[in-house]
């Protein structure tokens, strides 16, 4: 009988999630073709599961409770209500103080809706903060494994149900959808501080550079450098044997027949267009097109490729003191992540290119 683990679900293609695993779920886990298992929130695999992982050649990673804040532990409903009252009282007091300061400053701080002022008043998380439920070191290690397609399929055993919420934050989900998914999988163990943490945290991504493209570029440069060295050596060795004849220098250079035919075709097209313009058959908009100008009518892009540099607006976050995580290079990322990133870039980030155009034969 196949029994899935508690709060089991498919987060993305190749990523499975649950809150805990038991021996009853072993037959179900065998059908998932797992390569990696990540245990988050203090739970460690039992000896029975360790034997199963070694027998199935599954790598497992355990993140200790020292990487988490004490506020990540599930609290009772009474403590949640007390926390709500305490936070509401603090928020009302802080709002009253801000109103007093704004009225005292007068017209200088009249623009309270300024995004710069809102950014200064925003709360910024650090590892020393109690609201930082998962430390940055834990997040870096988790997402470096979670977003590497070489580790798929991955089972994420997350007792806190926060890692997938942070993944949704990276995917630019709405905060309401993130909280709803968190409440759906956490159930009665949901935490007020966890919801606040998901709302406050900002993630900034740094992507590793693809070593394959660097190696390919070096491999392309090496034969060119070798050819240059060989040509230099050949010139140095054969420089004494070259004999120059003055009659050869006085001759005109020979032009290949193919270039002559191309020039004749371009000249005939230009003459025909002039005749059509005089007769009024050809409009003003079609006087000079890119096909008439040949290769010199095209524009050439000078912008660098984003895939090589990993410079995406999708990876950037607003505000200061962002939690920086490092993800694998583009070739090791899953297809669903690259698809969502490229789609978001296409819809939200306008492309900026610097073009130049050749004006020869125009």
From Swiss-Prot:
It comes from the Eukaryota. It comes from Saccharomyces cerevisiae (strain ATCC 204508 / S288c) (Baker's yeast). This is Protein OCA4. Required for replication of Brome mosaic virus (BMV). Disruption phenotype: Exhibits an absence of G1 checkpoint in response to linoleic acid hydroperoxide (LoaOOH) treatment. Rescues the temperature sensitivity of CDC13-1 mutant. GO terms for cellular component: cytoplasm. Present with 5370 molecules/cell in log phase SD medium. Gene3D superfamilies: Protein tyrosine phosphatase superfamily (3.90.190.10).
């Amino acid at each position: 009988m196949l029994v899935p683990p508690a709060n089991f679900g498919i987060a993305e293609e190749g990523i499975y999630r649950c809150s805990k695993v038991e021996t009853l779920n072993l037959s179900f886990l065998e059908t998932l073709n797992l390569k990696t298992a990540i245990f988050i929130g203090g739970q460690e695999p039992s000896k029975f599961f360790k034997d199963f992982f070694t027998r199935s050649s599954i790598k497992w990673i355990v993140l200790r409770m020292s990487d988490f804040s004490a506020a990540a532990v599930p609290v009772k409903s009474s403590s949640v209500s007390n926390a709500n009252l305490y936070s509401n009282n603090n928020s009302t007091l802080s709002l009253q103080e801000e109103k007093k300061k704004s009225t005292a400053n007068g017209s200088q701080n009249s623009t309270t809706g300024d995004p710069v002022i809102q950014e200064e008043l925003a709360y910024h998380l650090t590892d020393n903060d109690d609201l930082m439920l998962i430390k940055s070191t834990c997040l870096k290690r988790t997402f470096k494994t979670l977003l590497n397609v070489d580790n798929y399929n991955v089972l994420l055993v997350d007792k806190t149900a926060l890692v997938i919420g942070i993944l949704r934050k990276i995917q630019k989900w709405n905060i309401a959808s993130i909280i709803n998914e968190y409440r759906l999988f956490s159930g009665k163990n949901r935490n007020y501080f966890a919801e606040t943490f998901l709302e406050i945290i900002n993630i900034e991504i740094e992507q590793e550079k693809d070593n394959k493209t660097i190696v390919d570029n070096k491999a392309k440069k090496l034969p060119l450098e070798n050819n240059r060295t060989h040509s230099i050596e050949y010139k140095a060795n054969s420089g004494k044997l070259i004999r120059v004849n003055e009659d050869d220098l006085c001759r005109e250079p020979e032009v290949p027949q193919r270039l002559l035919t191309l020039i004749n075709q371009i000249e005939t097209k230009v003459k025909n267009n002039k005749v059509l313009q005089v007769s009024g058959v050809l409009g003003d908009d079609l006087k000079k097109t890119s096909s008439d100008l040949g290769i010199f009518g095209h524009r050439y892009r000078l912008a660098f490729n984003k895939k090589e540099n990993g410079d995406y607006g999708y990876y950037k976050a607003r505000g200061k003191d962002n939690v920086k995580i490092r993800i694998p290079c583009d070739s090791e990322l899953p297809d669903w992540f690259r698809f969502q990133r490229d789609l978001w870039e296409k819809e939200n980030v306008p492309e900026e290119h610097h073009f130049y155009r050749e004006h020869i034969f125009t």
